[in-house]
Structure formats: structure tokens, C-alpha cells
Design a protein with these regions (language model features):
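Accessible peptide chain termini
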Residues: 1-2, 260
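Residues at the C-termini of beta-strands that transition into short coil/loop
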Residues: 120-122, 172, 230
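N-terminal ligand-binding/catalytic initiation module
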Residues: 2-168
Length: 260
């Protein structure tokens, strides 16, 4: 296979032109499938497919855990999105989100050696979306949810957590929460403050915001010291909000940021 030509990108270059050239250069996109076993003879073909392929199939039918031994399930993640909350772009739909999901699969492979397949699903109903993901899950060793709008993403995650035996990771929730929490713990160590005593103000109550709030309160931040703002202001108990925001609502008429 010919070596791919490198694009020299400079901040002064036109980003749109460079990006479109990068993605359209043949082969288009950023992913392809690699064969991991030799196919040099008829015998090789008879092992890769019929009749030899029947043997691992029979083994897996007797013990599903053997799928990790005989297939790529042990190193394969599904990057799943419906394109309803793509960073910086919003609800652009399943197909338009494909370049982003391919990009996330590239990160898995390049930085961790984990094979990943991007799967874009045209479904906004969270229960139906979860059911689709559950149906395709046997092929994968893990599920990475990506760019699914809140609060639907919480519903999808809760359903899959109950139904699947493989890891389910929502980057926008869990990845962001881990990073922010680590930053908070390090900052508190530097200023010599206890996590139980500090007040935390959060701007944003979507997928990332709620997940961050859950993790930092689990680490010791008191809910009474956590002040979460959404697009309409401070989340308080007298506002009509979804149950995920309501968990972190403050009493009405609270203005604690100005209080000691």
C-alpha cells in the first residue's frame, strides 16, 4: 500500500481547506480493515472461512467467553453515536457525525492499540437507541457512547449498564468527569484546602456537568456546596428541571456564591 502523503498544517493555513483535503484523500475517511491472519493458500481460506471456521463457532456456542479467545472481541470497541450533541456542532444527525466517530476510533487505535468501529445510529428515542446498542453488543468487548444529547444519554447509559456484561463508557460524561475531578483534587492539594469545605460553582448541566457533579460529590464535595447553573441560571428546587438536574438543586432564593 502506498505511503499516505503528509499534509503540513500551519495555524495560518485555511483549516477548512486542509481538513476537507485530509478527509477526502483516497482512501476517503480515516479507517480501514486489516486482515490479521495469512491468506496465502486454499488451506488458509478453508481455515478463515468454511469449513474450518465452524470449529471456533462450535466452541463459542458451548462457552460464550471463548469469543475472546477466537475472535477480535477481546480488542474491539464500538464508538456509538446518534449525532444529537456533537461538540461545537450540536444536533447534526447520525451520518454527519461519522467523521467525528471515525476520529475517536483513530484515537483508540493510535494511542492505545485498541481496534474501534464507528457506528452511527439514526435514532433519537433513548430506549430504542439503547435496545439497538444492546442488540449489536455481542460483537464488541466494550461500548463507547459519544455525542448523545442529555438527558437521553443518561437513559441510554442506565439501560445498558443493567443489561450488558461488557464495559459501557460515555466519554462526554465519564471521561470529562475523571479529568475535571483530577484537576480539582490537585488544585485543592496546592491550596491546602479540604474537599468537604470548598464551594464549587459549575456552569453547565448537560452530560458532562451532571457526570462531574456525581463524581466530585462522591469524592467528598457536599451537595449543599455545589451550585450548578444551566442556561436559565442556578438550578433550584422550585424550578422545573429533569431528575438528573434536580439531584443537585439548591433551596430557592439561594445566592451562596456571595456568602462566606
Amino acid at each position: 500500500m502506498a505511503e499516505a502523503k503528509m499534509i503540513e498544517y500551519h495555524p495560518m493555513n485555511d483549516l477548512k481547506t486542509s481538513s476537507l483535503e485530509y478527509h477526502s484523500r483516497k482512501p476517503a475517511g480515516k479507517l480501514q480493515i486489516k486482515i490479521t491472519k495469512p491468506i496465502r493458500s486454499v488451506d488458509d481460506l478453508s481455515l478463515a472461512y468454511t469449513p474450518g471456521v465452524a470449529e471456533p463457532c462450535l466452541e463459542i456456542s458451548k462457552d460464550v467467553k471463548k469469543a475472546y479467545q477466537y475472535t477480535n472481541k477481546n480488542n474491539l470497541v464500538a464508538v456509538v453515536s446518534n449525532g444529537s450533541a456533537v461538540l461545537g456542532l450540536g444536533d447534526i444527525g447520525a451520518l454527519a457525525s461519522k467523521p467525528v466517530m471515525e476520529g475517536k476510533a483513530v484515537l483508540f487505535k493510535h494511542f492505545a492499540g485498541v481496534d474501534a468501529v464507528d457506528i452511527e445510529i439514526d435514532e433519537k428515542n433513548p430506549v430504542k437507541l439503547a435496545n439497538i446498542i444492546e442488540a449489536i453488543s455481542p460483537s464488541f468487548g466494550g461500548i463507547n457512547l459519544e455525542d448523545i444529547k442529555a438527558p437521553a444519554c443518561f437513559v441510554v447509559g442506565e439501560i445498558l449498564k443493567k443489561k450488558l456484561s461488557i464495559p459501557v463508557f460515555h466519554d462526554d460524561q465519564h471521561g470529562t468527569a475523571v479529568i475535571v475531578s483530577a484537576g480539582l483534587l490537585n488544585a485543592l492539594e496546592i491550596v491546602n484546602k479540604k474537599i468537604e469545605e470548598v464551594k464549587v460553582v459549575m456552569t453547565g448541566a448537560g452530560a458532562a456537568g451532571i457526570a462531574i457533579a456525581k463524581l466530585i460529590t462522591a469524592l467528598g464535595v457536599k451537595k449543599s456546596n455545589l451550585f450548578m447553573f444551566d442556561s436559565k441560571g442556578l438550578i433550584t428546587a422550585n424550578r422545573e428541571v429533569n431528575k438528573y438536574k434536580a439531584e443537585f438543586a439548591q433551596p430557592p432564593h439561594q445566592s451562596p456564591v456571595c456568602q462566606e
